[in-house]
């Protein structure tokens, strides 16, 4: 049936956005932006119709969640770093059918997962920053999956990924890329640091 055509661990460092703007950081993240453009190129070459982003800035306290609204559009300001990302425009198509399917198969495999196809919840910057460079023309549909899970078992996260692959390959009529958006480990500089 469906195909998982590409999987990647990617950055979403907010200074990518600052790198576009006039000021002292202009151009400093061009290499990261070029990397995202290459992933975009590879997804298009593979015929990807939907990008599923595991977003490490979407914090949840119970279950796994899939933001699969039919459309995401607005202005985004980061509640974590409003001095880095402020009023960043976004406009992406969603994929409610795939989101509901992913949740259904995950639940069948014992992983409590909720799809949200009729929500006003906007994606977080772990989704929006990469899509700013990979989906400039609304070519792809986009899903966002909560990946900052405060009370989850690591083994359940692995099983969730396995269930998503089964859903895509066994039941979905299309081609998907999965992106793990976020650092494996990082720390922000302390206040008063130089």
Kindly give the residue locations of the regions a language model identified.
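Soluble secreted/lumenal catalytic domains
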Residues: 1-194
